[in-house]
Amino acid sequence: MSEKLAYHANCWGPLGGHPVGVTSVKDLFYVTFGDMRRAFADIAAAGYQAVEVFDGNLLEHAGDIGQFRRLLSDHGLSLLSVYSGGNFIYPDILDDEFWRIEKAAALAAEAGAVHLVVGGGAKRAGGVRDGDYERLGAALDRVADVAAKHGLSAHYHPHLTTMAETPDEIRHVFAHTRIGFCPDTAHLAAAGGDPAALIEEHYDRVTYVHLKGWQRDPFAFTPIDRGDLDLRPTLEVLDARGFDGWIAVELDFWPDPLDGARASRAWLQQHSKVS
């Protein structure tokens, strides 16, 4: 199995959207409101090789991507992936959403990233309408085209609160798109799925994986060494398949982010062939 390990920098501050995005769809980038220098130092100290960041955190360095790359290299890290997203089902705003995704992809490529990950597929107040999955699928194909233009691999990240929560909903999405699949183990399990089984089912789309722990009651995301989600079957599937892509550990919040990163790294050392 892969020995390439990354960590998402989202744990080092609260998640929000760029404030300009309140009145401008094209500017609604994700942002971790935290100190990325500290995040990168901690991620390196915990033993990871690369990072994933939100598109808005990369946008902060749009005038000098070289500075961002130096910030990473100072800690012996590289940028692996950038995360973005969209509603993807409302034709009137789609071009503005893709202005943002195009910007994110261009900056990601300039910063040396390999992957572009997107979430989304809005759930309407009145529920999913006929044609919404087709619209989402077409938009995700467009994401894949944008990513390819910039030399990136594109992946869809099924997520709670979107049109792709349950295994059946995920199948419905993938019936309408050719984009890759970035499984997030916690989101898949929390929606009633079996992460290992879903990775096996859609393995031909999987070249990048998010590992995250999950606690059922009270609901919480956790380091992967605790909670109610046993990730050993997921690692077994990846190992049996000879997976050689990157694995990113993700954790949305933890009181001590460095402690959480170290705990997950130690668990991986104990339970997988990752060293």
Role assignments for model-derived ranges:
Residues A108-R129, A248:
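Active-site groove signature of glycoside hydrolases
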Residues K4, A50-V51, D141-D228:
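Acidic/histidine-rich catalytic cores of soluble enzymes
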Residues Y7-C11, V53-D55, S81-G86, V118-G120, ...:
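A cross-domain feature marking catalytic cores of carbohydrate-active enzymes
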Residues M1-A109, D141, A148, L152, ...:
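N-terminal pre-domain/capping segments
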Residues D64-F68, D96-E102, R129-L140, P167-D168, ...:
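Charged helix-capping and loop-helix junction motifs
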Residues L77, A113-V114, L152, R241-G245:
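A short helix->loop->beta-strand "cap" motif at the edges of active sites that frequently abuts
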Residues V31-T32, V53-I65, N87-E97, R124-V128, ...:
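Acidic-and-aromatic substrate-binding clefts and catalytic sites of carbohydrate-active enzymes
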Residues A45-Y48, A113, V206, F243-D244:
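A structural motif
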